[in-house]
A protein has these predicted regions:
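Non-heme Fe(II)/2-oxoglutarate
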Residues: 2-118
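Short, cationic low-complexity segments
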Residues: 175-178, 230-247
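Conserved double-stranded beta-helix
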Residues: 86-97, 107-167
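Catalytic core of non-heme Fe(II) oxygenases with the double-stranded beta-helix
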Residues: 136-194, 206-210, 215-230
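Short, active-site-adjacent segments that bind or coordinate small-molecule cofactors and metal centers
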Residues: 90-94, 198, 209
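A short beta-turn/loop motif at secondary-structure boundaries
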Residues: 132, 203-204
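Short, charged beta-turn/beta-strand-edge "cap" motif at the junction between a beta-strand
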Residues: 194-197, 202
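A structural signal for short, well-ordered beta-strand segments and their strand-loop junctions
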Residues: 45, 70, 124-126, 189-190, ...
Length: 247
């Protein structure tokens, strides 16, 4: 199954909120612009299919994680961040380990029809990252994903070493807050243009997961234009809720 490459979310070292030339403080952003709705409940936890579970952990236990310490951005709402990740104890840094192309292709082949059935629309795979390693002190700031390519997504939980689990903060279309916790074998299907993050600082040695992303098969410029004025980064829950109180 072909995978479409997504656009970069930075341009000339400067954050771009959605489409190029649209920054987080662009005066055209409007609280009246909200994300599309595909499902009454925009997230669902399932179990990773056995054939993917076995392949994932066969690869995982042989991986070496590399630190990604470059590319720190000075975000106007989050401060210092790498890919939306801050750290309360040190400069932001994350780790990464790639998985095989064969696993990514197999995962898209298996997961795509599952996400299509759940969302009710035909999808086109866009991008998958390897396994992301969040170190002690990490905060994943509240955000929406990239409207060109990250419209429907899934999180595959991989591993953690920590005294407590680490919640994903997810806000549905009515802006209700949900905490989602993961254990081995858990997968979260979610509408990734809904606001989400992990706002409680992580305490532990590491937390690891991976992401797969899709866009609707029909998602041309006229649909993107509809959502280009949608704000996609927020300092915290209060900022997010107050922003939409304007409507």
């Amino acid at each position: 199954m072909p995978v479409v490459q997504c656009m970069k979310c930075t341009q000339d070292g400067k954050y771009v909120d959605q489409l190029e030339k649209l920054t987080v403080y662009d005066h055209t952003l409007s609280p009246k612009v909200k994300p599309p709705k595909f499902n009454k409940v925009p997230f669902k936890k399932i179990k990773l299919p056995d054939e993917l579970y076995d392949d994932l952990y066969d690869e995982y236990y042989n991986l070496e994680f590399e630190p990604l310490i470059g590319g720190i951005q000075d975000h106007p709402e989050w401060g210092k961040t790498i890919s939306g990740i801050s750290n309360i104890k040190t400069n932001p840094h994350v780790g990464y380990a790639g998985v095989s192309d064969a696993f990514v292709e197999k995962a898209f082949d298996i997961l795509t029809p599952i996400v299509e059935e759940w969302s009710g629309i035909e999808l086109l795979p866009t991008v998958s990252y390897g396994i992301r390693h969040y170190p002690d002190g990490s905060v994943l700031n509240l955000h929406r994903d990239i409207i060109q390519s990250h419209v429907l997504s899934c999180i595959i939980y991989v591993d953690r070493i920590s005294p407590e689990n680490w919640a994903l903060d997810y806000y549905d279309h009515q802006h209700n807050h949900h905490e989602v916790f993961f254990e081995k074998g858990d997968v979260l299907l979610y509408e990734s243009l809904c606001v989400h993050g992990r706002t409680t600082p992580f305490e532990g040695e590491f937390y690891r997961n991976m992401y797969f992303h899709w866009r609707p098969a029909v998602w041309e410029e006229q649909f993107l234009e509809k959502y280009r004025r949608m704000k996609s980064s927020f300092r915290d829950e209060e900022h997010f809720l107050q922003y939409y109180d304007k409507t």
